[in-house]
Amino acid sequence: YDVVFASFSLGTPDLRGAIEKMNEACSGTVAVFHFAGLPYWEQIMLDLWPDLHGVPYLPGPKAEIIFNLLYRMGIYPDVSVSSYEHRLTVPDLDAGVDALRGRLLVETPEQEGILRRYLAARLIPGGDGLVLGHRVHRACLRWEPHRPGGGLRAV
């Protein structure tokens, strides 16, 4: 393939294997898009998981893990980072609780109360309801895996 890419999909136990497969399949450019910081839902999980479930939340790998693995593999990608303000908009507090209940595995009234208090302290009026804003950073790592004469080089 001329271009092989993965978009926010490398939360795999065998990251090296996934990268090797992309390199093998690509005759042009490999591009990996991944978070360079916490997305809003992971920030909420990091904040609430201990209170909800009694254990810390362990976020998945981010772009720096992918970069470091590529570096150890002898791949030196071009890296670009962009950011935007993610806005979770809900009509009211109840809808906010409902929107996050499943992701946070909220099952009991006590857990719902924890989530409700968290959102009540953070949702702000805006637009068509209540808004939870969060700055999201994304990275693009690009490289050319195959070159005549051997070796790997960034694009």
Where are the regions a protein language model picked out?
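Acceptor-substrate binding/catalytic loop of class I
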Residues: D51-A63, L104-V106
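A conserved beta-strand element that flanks and buttresses the S-adenosyl-L-methionine
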Residues: V4-F5
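Conserved Class I S-adenosyl-L-methionine
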Residues: M73-V155
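Conserved beta-strand signature within the Rossmann-like core of class I S-adenosyl-L-methionine
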Residues: C26-Y40
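Short, glycine-/aromatic-enriched active-site segment of Class I SAM-dependent methyltransferases
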Residues: A36-P56
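Short alpha-helix
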Residues: Y57-S80
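A short, conserved alpha-helix within the catalytic core of class I
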Residues: L10-S27
